Amino acid sequence: MFKKLIAGILISSFSLGSTYASELSEKTNIVRIMNNYITSISCMNDKVQLKDIFTIDKPSENGSTYYVLWNGDIGCNGGTGTHSYYVSEVSRFSPNRPLLVTTNDAFGDNNEAFWNADKASINYRFIQSMKQISPSEFEIVSYAYADDKFGGVDRGNMGPANKFRYTVSFIEDEGWKITKQVLLEQNK
């Protein structure tokens, strides 16, 4: 009985270790893939590091999904408002398929159609930090321009008035949504 228990524990620890190694191995590959990708589509970018990669779906027989925070000037336009942060989705649809960058808008709110819908959104140009709370919840700190709801005084194109902490949650059948917005600082 004791030998079976020890054998079970050892087998479990090996399988957990191999899952972790697979996830770390994929993240290491994603660093290389993303750095090649962002260099090919943008200028003035910082290199992606392991800390910029967030696991959404761990490697399994159904594939895996990661979100990657990075910054750059897509298209190399060189304007004062063209450099931004992005959250890209990198997925593998099965263990024997390659990792693919599937979008630069993983949360679905960094696009003109969403901005024109007059919904609360994150200003990706001014992201300060992104922290994963769980696979379905993130905390993002970013600045935003003054508006009727929060007020504040902007200081030009590069000086938005308000600093917020956003909680972004995945809601079943709705997708990613801002579920909490807390004002941290304000220019008056």
List PLM regions with ranges.
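Composition- and surface-driven signal marking solvent-exposed, interaction-prone regions
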Residues: 1-4, 181-183
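Sec-dependent N-terminal signal peptides
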Residues: 4-15
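Terminal domain-start segments
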Residues: 19-65, 175-188
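Acidic, small-residue rich beta-repeat scaffolds with periodic aromatic anchors
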Residues: 22-27, 121-188
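Surface-exposed acidic loop/strand-edge motifs in secreted or periplasmic proteins
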Residues: 48-123
